[in-house]
Every structure is written in C-alpha cells, then in structure tokens.
C-alpha cells in the first residue's frame, strides 16, 4: 500500500484501554500455555495496528509541521502515548509473571522476557512526566523546523544550511556559519529553558519511579540489558586513547590540504580546495541510481528498494515547514518501512539514501518476526545496519559521483572517524547533566565546552557563543532522545569491522550482514554482535586493533 493511501483515524482511547485491560485479564485467567500464546499473538497484532496509526500521524506532521490536523493529532498522542505505555506495562507485567514462563520462553525466546523486565519500570506515576516531556520535545522541534536564517539576502532553514557550510570559498563558509550560529544564539534562552525543564521533569520522574537519577531509568527504557553506564564510561576512555589522536591528525592533514594555517570549526565540512564531492544530479537521479545499486548489491536489497519506490515510502527533499534531520520508521501493520530525510544537494544525500536505507532494509527483512518487539532491535544494534550499509554500497559510488567517487569515500571515512569523539562528547555531557540535575544552564554549557576540548583538543570555533559551550543546542538527540547518541558510535565501530572485512571478502561479509538484519531485535546487543560475527567495542580490544588499519585505509584512498 502506498503511504498516501494509508488510512488514518484517531484511536478511540476508551476502546484502546478496554483492549489492554481485557488482554491483561485474559493472560491472568488462561488455563493453558497455548491459550496464553494465542492471546500474546493477538495482542501483538493489535499493537502493530495501534503503533502504525501513531507513526502515520507522526510522519505526516514531520513532512509539514504547520499542518493543523496532524498537529492536533500529535498533541493528542503527546497526551495519550504515556497512558498507552503505562497500559502496555501492565500487560507486560502479567506476561512476565506467567505461570507458563517456560512454555512462553520456548515460543518467544528468553530475550522477550528481558525486554518485558525493562518495561516494568514504568507505572501510572510516570504519565504526567512523560506528557510534559513529549510537549517539550515538540516545542524544540517546532523552533528548529520553523527556523529562518538570513544569509546574503536569502532565507534558509537549519536543514538547508549544510551545502553553504561546505563551500570552498572560506569567507563564504565563515559568513554562512556565523548566520547559522546567530539563529541558535538568538534562541539561547528558549533552548536553555526547554532543556532545563526537560532535565527537571525527567529527574522527577526517575525519583517518582524509585530511581536515584534519570540515568539508570533511561538505560532501562532503552532496553540496555547487557551493560551499564560504567561500561559506557570505559568505552569512552578507549575512544579518547585511540580515535581522539587520529581525529586530530586527520584535521591537521585537512588543514594542509586546504592550505589553511589557522584551521577553524567552520573549515571542517570542506574537505577539498575545489569543493566536496556532491552528487551529479537531483533527487530523481539519486533514487534511480540507488535502485540500480541495490538491485546489483543483492536480490534481497533489490526487492526491498523496489518495494520502497513502488509504495512511495520515502519523503526525501528539504523544504520549508519540514522537520529537520532524517529518520526511518515503520508501519508494521503494512510491513512497510518509511524513510524521511532532507536532501539538500550535498554528499549527505547519499549518506541518507544508504544510512536510512540500511535501517529500512533491516526492518523489511525482520517483518516476519512474531513480535513487534523483535522487528526493530535496540538502538545500539539498530545503527549497525544503517552505518554498515553506507560502506557496503561503496563499489557503486561512481553512479552518483562519477570521477569524484574517491573523494566521497575519503570524506565518508574521514567523517566517520572524526565523528566518534564528538559522539562520546555528547554522551559524556548527558551523563554529567543527569548526575547534576540542579546545575544551571551556564554551568551545563561550561561543562560541555570542557568535555569537547577533552575529546577534540584542537577544536576552535572562532565564535564566543559556541566557545561558551552552546554547540549542543543543534543536536536534537540531547533534547528528545537522551543517551541514544552513544549508540551511533558503538555501531560505527561495528560498521568499520564490516568495511574492513568487505574489502577482503564481499560475499561472506554481505551474508553476515543480511543474517544480522534478519535477526531484527530478537536478541540483545551483545548477542546480535555474535550473530553478525562482530567483535564487541566495549569488552574487546577491537578499537585498538582497527584504528591503525582504518588510518592506513584512509591514507590509501587516491584523491
């Protein structure tokens, strides 16, 4: 079914509450394991329908944040999703406490019960806090989506600025950068206020649910069953020792290549004197060549991308009133992934058509899973599929960039390597924030700047506002997806492993990757790494092992 034809009707919350309540009662009164198994399967179908409805409304508002109808629907879900989650927790508790635990584990797997255990942290006390949190996230999104940045007489949104920041003319770059920074500086009070309120709301929710702070609660809500914040801190140390020095070397090399002695932050997005490699065509050109690429990559990826095109399951081009960024979601009732992005004519468009397609492909391959909980893995594992797809498609980059394909590959690898120290900065900052919920906005910004100079010691913003520690205002995950960001870095280390293996044995690596995609979320992060034949970034020396190999690979790309 095409996305535009998917019907939308606001759920009747009284009926929804009744189904949750009846399911809980049926689980409790079931006399046979087979009876409970059927109830759980029926409940899974109900949830697929319900969450598909929620996602249709979410995507349509993302495409036009001024659409009054879907804005009202979004407000409705901001109020009611916490209620739905709490009702779902009660059903989860009934299943978790089942007298037929052995039979249920045999049918659905032990991991299902680990996920249920994570859900049990919520109860009705969380509802008002989650409602407030949702409203604050929407408020942040609207400010960004409706941004108006005036540069050289033209008006841009935040998501339309990246091409300007990559311009080979340094003065042009600097002016564009200053215009973008001014938008965030003009809204400093709003961003500080929204985030301060978010931190307090989340901390109060954690206390209400019996947690010392929000960190432990959110780790549970992220279904992190294999590791805790202490393990993440050790991993950040690994990054500091391996990739921070390499990133500094890479930027030094970039400065020399550009002929710049006083390298600044606004120079980082420009990789070559004659400009970055941008795709040789518009959105239709990109989609057409992506279809050819995915058909040639494998039968599975070809079928998947044909399905996405046929059912119009992508909204790709940046435009006014559209939410910033890119994401992949799914309408599981229709077994359909969906890709949302903001194409802007840069190499980032190809990053999206591979990254978000990696998410979508995994979702497409795991739609056969019995439970909705198993269609998507936890975020740490989910980002492996997307980041790996960026590398698995390297042999086809000539389709998009022609003779500049190697420049794209260099920029992609350089960007991935230098990204990780930034990613752990964002994570470390959030741990500080929720360990110190009473810190003032000024204290938060000061701490952020300390941390970014620790992980990126050569950073020079050439701007007082950003030097005050305000860069994170533009990182939406800090506002609406706390502690998610470290997952990008963990997955990137896994994607690097697939890249190095792919260059050695394409067929075998692709087979491992597809096997991992099919597994969906049926196992925990650490177990999925085993399924995908990947070494664990947290408890092995893989980062130390691959860093010199990646440096060698980067330097070997002829540009």
PLM segments and residue spans:
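Active-site recognition of the HExxH zinc-binding catalytic motif
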Residues: 341-366, 383-386, 391, 429, ...
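Post-HExxH zinc-binding segment in Zn-dependent metallohydrolases
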Residues: 241-242, 366, 377-405, 412-414, ...
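Long, well-ordered alpha-helical segments
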Residues: 195-206, 211-212, 250-251, 358-368, ...
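C-terminal, non-catalytic "cap/extension" segments appended to globular domains
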Residues: 317, 353, 361, 388, ...
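A well-structured
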Residues: 1-276, 289
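Inter-helical turn/loop segments and adjacent helix faces that build the functional surface
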Residues: 229-230, 253, 257, 297-300, ...
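Glycine- and acidic
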Residues: 121-122, 180-187, 227-233, 269-279, ...
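Auxiliary, metal-adjacent structural segments of Zn-dependent hydrolase domains
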Residues: 274-334, 346-347
């Amino acid at each position: 079914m095409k996305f535009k034809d998917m019907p939308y009707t606001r759920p009747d919350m009284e009926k929804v509450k009744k189904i949750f309540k009846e399911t809980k009662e049926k689980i409790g009164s079931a006399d046979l394991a087979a009876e409970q198994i059927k109830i759980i399967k029926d409940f899974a179908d109900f949830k697929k329908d319900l969450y598909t409805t929620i996602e249709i409304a979410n995507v349509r508002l993302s495409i036009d944040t001024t659409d009054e109808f879907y804005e009202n629907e979004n407000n409705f879900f901001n109020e009611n999703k916490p209620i739905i989650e709490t009702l779902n927790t009660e059903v989860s508790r009934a299943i978790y406490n089942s007298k037929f635990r052995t039979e249920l584990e045999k049918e659905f797997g032990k991991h299902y019960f680990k996920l249920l255990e994570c859900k049990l942290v919520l109860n009705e006390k969380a509802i008002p806090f989650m409602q407030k949190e949702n409203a604050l996230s929407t408020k942040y999104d609207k400010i960004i989506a409706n941004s108006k940045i005036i540069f050289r007489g033209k008006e841009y949104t935040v998501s339309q600025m990246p091409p300007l920041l990559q311009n080979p003319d340094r003065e042009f770059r600097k002016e564009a950068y200053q215009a973008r920074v001014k938008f965030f500086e003009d809204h400093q009070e709003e961003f500080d206020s929204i985030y301060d309120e978010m931190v307090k709301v989340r901390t109060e929710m954690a206390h209400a649910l019996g947690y010392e702070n929000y960190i432990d609660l959110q780790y549970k809500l992220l279904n992190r069953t294999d590791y805790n914040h202490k393990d993440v801190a050790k991993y950040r140390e690994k990054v500091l020792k391996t990739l921070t020095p390499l990133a500094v070397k890479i930027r030094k090399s970039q400065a020399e290549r550009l002929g710049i002695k006083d390298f600044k932050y606004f120079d980082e997005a420009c990789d070559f004197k004659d400009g970055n490699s941008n795709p040789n065509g518009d959105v239709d050109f990109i989609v057409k060549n992506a279809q050819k690429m995915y058909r040639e990559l494998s039968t599975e990826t070809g079928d998947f991308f044909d399905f996405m095109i046929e059912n119009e399951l992508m909204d790709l081009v940046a435009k006014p009133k559209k939410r910033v960024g890119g994401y992949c979601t799914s309408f599981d009732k229709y077994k359909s992934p969906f890709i949302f992005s903001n194409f802007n004519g840069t190499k980032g468009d190809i990053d999206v058509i591979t990254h978000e397609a990696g998410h979508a492909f995994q979702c497409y391959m795991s739609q056969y899973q019995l439970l909705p909980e198993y269609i998507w893995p936890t975020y740490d594992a989910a980002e492996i599929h997307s980041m790996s797809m960026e590398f698995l498609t390297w042999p086809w980059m000539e389709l998009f960039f022609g003779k500049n394909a190697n420049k794209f590959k260099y920029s992609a690898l350089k960007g991935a390597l230098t990204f990780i120290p930034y990613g752990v900065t964002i994570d470390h900052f959030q741990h500080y924030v929720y360990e110190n919920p009473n810190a003032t906005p000024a204290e938060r910004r000061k701490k952020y700047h300390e941390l970014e100079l620790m992980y990126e010691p050569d950073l020079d913003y050439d701007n007082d506002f950003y030097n005050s520690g305000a860069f994170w205002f533009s990182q939406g995950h800090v506002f609406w997806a706390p502690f998610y960001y470290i997952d990008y870095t963990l997955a990137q280390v896994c994607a690097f492993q697939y890249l190095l293996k792919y260059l050695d044995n394409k067929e075998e690596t692709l087979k491992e990757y597809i096997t991992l995609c099919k597994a969906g979320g049926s196992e925990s992060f650490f177990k999925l790494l085993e399924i995908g034949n990947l070494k664990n970034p947290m408890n092995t020396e893989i980062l130390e092992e691959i860093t010199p190999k990646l440096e060698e690979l980067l330097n070997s790309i002829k540009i």
